[in-house]
Structure formats: C-alpha cells, structure tokens
Amino acid sequence: MLNGLNAQNHKTLKVLFLGNSYTYVNNLPQLIKDIALANGDTLLFDSNCPGGHTFNNHFNNATSISKINSQAWDCVVLQAQSQEPSFSPAQVEAQTLPYAIKLDSIIKHNNICAETVFFETWGRKNGDASNCAAYPPICTYIGMQNRLRSSYKLFADTTHSIMSPAGEAWRKSIALNPNLELYSSDQSHPALEGSYLTACVFYETLFHKSVLSNTYTAGLSATNVGFLQQVAHDVLNDSLLVWNIGKYPSCITTDLTEISYQPNVIIYPNPTQKTLHTNTNLPFKIYDILGILCLSGNKSNSINIESLKSGVYFIELSYLNSTKKIRFVKE
C-alpha cells in the first residue's frame, strides 16, 4: 500500500521522458512535478517527445540516445506510439518489443540502477477506426485497451521493468464516471482531466507515495480532482505486483559506512549466461533470491557463473567498510 509520508521522507527524482504527443500535450512531466512539489517532493526532468515517435524512432534518434546517456537518471519513461502496441501480438513482438528491449538495455548500461518505466497509454475513445478492418479486436475502445495492456505488460515483464498503468486508470474512470471527459476533441489525445489522471498515476508509480489529498489541482474542480486521485490510487494499489512495482529492485545498496570515494559500480551484461563483468576488482559474494551464498571470490572484474542455475541473484561487492548489492539475472 502506498501511504502518505511526512516531511522527513521528501524525495528527489531525476526522470527522463521519451514519448510523443501523448506525453507533451498538457505538459505531463510538469503536471507530475507540480503534484510532487505539493507533497514536498522534487521531480527533475528532461524529455524528448516528437510527434508520433515509436520505440524504433527513439532508438534511432540521436537526441533520445544522447539524453539517456547525459546523466544517471533514476527513471526513464518510455511511451510508444499510441496505436502500435495495440496491433496483433505477432506484429508487436516483431515490430515494437525488440526496440523496447534495446532502449532498456541502453538505459541500464548508462546507469545499472535506473528503472525503466513503460507508460501504458489509453485506447482511442471509439477504437482505432483507421486499423479496424485490418485487425478487428481494436475496433472498440475496450478491445484496443486490452491489447495496450497486454503489450505494455509484455514490455515490462520482458525487461524486468515497471509498467505505469495510466491506461488502466482511464479504463476505471470511464467505467465509474463516463460523463467526466478525459479525451480532447480528437477522441485520442488527453484533455487536461486525462493528463491530470495520468500524472496522478505517475506520481504514485515514481515516488511510491499516495496522491490522495494532494493540493495541486491544475485548475480542475475539487470534485473531479478528488475522484481522479482516488481512481489513480486504487488502480496502483490493487495490483502493485502486476505493474512490477517493487518486484524487480534493480539496485540494493547497504552502506555500513558512507564513504565519499566509494566506486560507482557497474555490472554487465544483465541478464547474462556465462560471465558477469564489473568495472571494479573487489571481493564479491553472490547470493540467490533466498539469501543463500552461491559463489564468492576476491576479484570481481570477470566472474564465471556457468555453475549457477537460471534465476535472480544478488552480487555483493565489498569496499573498505562498505558493501553494495546489485541484482542480476542468470539466463
């Protein structure tokens, strides 16, 4: 459960948004920042959101790649072109999933502790008329929304990343209060109400705190604000593990003594099959997910892990009076 936290738990996050018009309409990152600020938190963000951009486009966009590598982001939000993830499973697996994987790999290579967050969008109000004949399941809003959910869940599960279920919050809002219009006049892009709901979902997803009773309203009525906050909160908390929130901790650091010159440890590749490399040469221990010691040694720059079974492990690296634990996957 995501609960409201006091002033001693204020957080600062650095987040990069890579998407398109669904992200830049109504300036979604700024809405999230304003909600965070009202709760004493700080969102430092950058974005690259050219209209209609796909994951493939971002992978081949020098600006997007440069921004990923520009600093150690806490989170990078990836939003696909609005229709593409709703296409047939075979088409999504061939056309979209490979670039979700490639972008996630670049993000993790830049900062192994970064979290990739897949921004699940919403179906068009009356389905995708332009692609209905070619793929009838997306002829309706519900059919399109179901495919979006499945695809974004696929992206998140495949890369061991987070899914921010904005589209599921839209689904719940529409079911409970169909008269509250979330769409703009084109029945695709968000009205301010839709962007505010999405921002509430993202605040809870990124900061792991409750949005309930947040005082930032974006100029919306108190009634609508309260309703949208509750919808976002309910959707997040009903299914935290479905959205992979807290399921795949990318980095766990246990500092016995804080040391200003502790090395910035990177492990690669992750996932891996035979060998795990680090950018240090420190004593190491490898534990399985149950905390059982599986391997240990004195030099961590190249570790043979062929003896490990497939699964999730943690490597613990020791440096003076400090230890760092990092999660990795053996395939």
Residue spans for each PLM region:
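Bacterial Sec-dependent N-terminal signal peptides
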Residues: 1-10, 256, 314, 325
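Conserved beta-strand termini and adjacent loop/short-helix elements that scaffold enzyme active sites
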Residues: 46-50, 119, 166, 331
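C-terminal outer-membrane/trafficking sorting elements
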Residues: 257-331
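Conserved catalytic region of serine esterases and O-acyltransferases that act on ester linkages
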Residues: 11, 182, 189, 193, ...
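Conserved SGNH/GDSL esterase-like catalytic core that processes O-acyl groups on lipids
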Residues: 12-16, 22-101, 106, 112
